Amino acid sequence: MREQPKNQISPDGLKVWRLQEIIISAVCLLIVIAVAVLSYYFHWPYWISGVLGAVWLLGSIVTVFIIPKVRHKVWRYEVHEHEIDIQSGIFVVTRVIVPMVRVQHVDTSQGPLLKKYNLATVKISTAATVHSIPALEMEEADRLRDSISRLARVTDDDV
């Protein structure tokens, strides 16, 4: 059995994931508040709002504080001369080996939150799908993109 990939994503990725989850939790809180207001106006049982509020609170705690930390711990990647090794997953751990001969192109992308922390996601496209390595420091993402592109081109020329 192979060893785990050695490289982890940036620690700032944890902050980005937490911010994303806070935004999602805030939207969900607005829905809970809307249900509470509707409960008041339409004389629905108040326990509905209470249960929704409790579910929101528990879900927010888990998705903001626990899942990002575990997710950061399990995300790993490593680039070899002939393949890219990506491992992710919390409950179901997925290990993907992408042969360099299958790589069609490599992109980096940044959303507003990633840009705030100078992070980027590297997307590796094959004929079948797109594999992503999230929340890498921008310099590392650029280096990785260029390295994969160079290795894929060399491998492609050899075939």
Swiss-Prot record:
Keywords: Cell membrane, Membrane, Transmembrane, Transmembrane helix. GO terms for cellular component: plasma membrane. Signal peptide: none annotated. InterPro entries: YdbS-like_PH. The chain crosses the membrane at residues 22-42, 47-67. It comes from the Bacteria. It is a multi-pass membrane protein. This is UPF0699 transmembrane protein YdbS. It comes from Bacillus subtilis (strain 168).
